[in-house]
Amino acid sequence: MKSKPVEKKRKVRDEESDSESDDELANGLFDGVLEASEDEEDYIPSDEIDDVDSESEVSEGSEDAEEEEEEEEGDDDALLSDDIPSDDEMGKLSKDAEELEITEPGVDPKPKHQEEEDRNYKVVKDANGGERYVYDEIDPVYDSDDSDAQGPVNTIGNIPLSFYDSYPHIGYDINGKKIMRPATGDALQSLLDTIEVPKGWTGLTDVNTGNPLNLTQEELELVRRVQHGLVPDEGYDPYPDTVEWFTSKQETMPLSAAPEPKRRFLPSKNEAKQVMKLVRAIREGRILPYKPPEEREREEEEKEEVQFDIWQDEEPAAPNPMHIPAPKLPPPGYEMSYNPPEEYLPTEEEREEWEKTDPEDREKEFLPQKFNSLRKVPAWGTLVKERFERCMDLYLAPRVRKNRLNIDPNSLLPKLPSPAELKPFPTVVQTIFRGHEGTVRSIAIDPTGVALATGGSDGTVRVWELLTGRQVWSVKLSSEDPVYTVRWRPTKDAFVLAASAGEDVFLMVPPHSSVTPTLDQASRDVLAAGFGYATNGQQPATAPGKEPAGKWARPGTKLEDAGVLVRVTVRSAVKVITWHRRGDHFATVSPEGQRSSVAIHTLSKHLTQIPFRKLHGLAQTVVFHPLKPLFFVATMRTVRCYDLQKVELVKIVQPGAKWISSLDIHSGGDHLIVGSYDRRLLWHDLDLSNRPHKTMRFHPKAIRAVRFHKGGLPLFADASDDGTLQIFYGKVPNDQLESPTIVPVKQLKGHKVVNQVGVVDIDWHPREPWCVSAGADGTARLWM
């Protein structure tokens, strides 16, 4: 019962021992054979090999091989007959294997330490405690079968790595150890690897190892040489020096070995004498080069002909610095073509008129003609005459050389400061005043800077709060005529507003939150003072049959209740109202009134006067001098300055404009600006000249209003029909020798153009750098 399992177990152990012994003995015999072969190649001398017969060597070798095989078989039998050998038995077997090494007679055995160095393996213990031979990796040399490429580390053979996808390793090395799969990074590491490319990087992966396949330094050098068109092998010389294995020179032994004499290395004196003799003969002409007879005869004939250079002794003259080249003829035009366009050909009437005109009075000396081809064009009959006249012009007409100056146009322009350095000035719209129906024709800010008055085409006058845009008061002056102008009385002792509608000028005291009862009563007293003066019989009498220059009256109960206290009626429609700086006089302009177009009104006396019997042109606008008793009247083309005390003409200013639209004077009284309908803004220095000091064109359409800042700020502005306002920085220096500084700083856009009309009027705040504008779009705007 128990014998069967024991036998089975014994049989299994025998098989395991057989396999282990076979592996160990096979390795041992293989190593011994290699050592024997190396010993034979290294230590057998050649003289002994010659003495030994080849046949005996073969027989001896075969006998030795048979003996070794018998011994190995005996050892195998011994191993098969027992169980796994012990350590003593393994030592005995290894000793027997050492005794079985093949040695040749007459050959000295190697020393033991040299044999250990020459061995290509190591002896280690296996799992059972036995010896195990671990061979070194083969390093191929130049004489090996594969010396170019190193043997693969992975020894799995030609097997796809996909078979190892489910294993942590990818194969085995030559020693049977597992080659673990290389670690792979995440996407960020892959991106960094592609950015920081190492030296020799190819972007490929080794199929056998899974590692990146990089090029070695030798491979990189090989690639570089191929790219540069060089020979791949650095040591290869494609153009070696020629080795003459055979020569045509016959080298014979000299008869004498004496050294060469010095005369062999020095030039011959006899030859030098012969050469100098030939040189002297060539210089003297006794030796001539060979020439054909024909050429020699031709030279002799040329020598017989004597030629003289008449300009031989003439010295070159310097070029005349006064020479002026003749002007060039103008290039021909289309009318001189033999086939001109139809519009250049004259009609029958033009031809007859040209023929009847005298040749001296003709604009052209010829009439354009048309020919179908150039060959049909006849000769020009007056060619000789034209050439003669051209020569006469060049001969008789004097020429003048004009020196042109190469001047940069930008250097002639004045250096203007930057607009950012000239602040403050208005830049943006702050408040929009809406309420009028139609065009807002006039606008004005009161002397305190709180209230704003506007007059429009709807015949109404409206008063607004300047900062909030709230309408405070409104009155309708006329249902037929528009309100052309509104102007505040310039003094602060009364709150009086003047407005014109048709032939009437209305004086009113509008209610406002800033007006105190005392100020309101003072304003009413100023307007009512003139009625007492007229009642006392002080009103000047007019000639019989003529209307008075102005009628002062009360407007009626309805308007008086609204705040309109006085109405002044003149002979024609009033378009302009201008106050004197003291507030007791104001002037009106009626362009259609002819002689009575300009009138001066006295508020304290309710008196109207016509200062001019005759005006040279239609009056457009007037303005009082801010400091002197001077009165400026602008007609269509000129501005006349009158002295009201002396009643005389002081100056005539000629702006050069075709039609003057507006006028204003600087607070200093020495400078004047004029706006015109021909799109020009003109600055006049009254002390300098009657002509404009500077002309500015910044608008594509007409300029309707110009205004200086009265509060001391160096600002002025103009309003145009293109819907824009142009703000200028205008500084007047105290020194009269200096010119004023005029810089355009800002263009304000906001108003819409209605029926070719844009911005109609403009006014400045008395203290702040703010301005207000009235436009044809029915709005008024406050710019800050």
UniProtKB/Swiss-Prot annotation:
Main location: nucleus
Transmembrane feature ranges: none
Region span, Disordered: 1-125
Domain of life: Eukaryota
Cysteine disulfide links: none
GO BP: maturation of 5.8S rRNA from tricistronic rRNA transcript (SSU-rRNA, 5.8S rRNA, LSU-rRNA); maturation of LSU-rRNA from tricistronic rRNA transcript (SSU-rRNA, 5.8S rRNA, LSU-rRNA)
Keyword Nucleus: yes
Compositional bias per record (Basic and acidic residues), positions renumbered to this chain: 107-125
Name of the featured protein: Ribosome biogenesis protein ERB1
The species this protein was found in: Podospora anserina (strain S / ATCC MYA-4624 / DSM 980 / FGSC 10383)
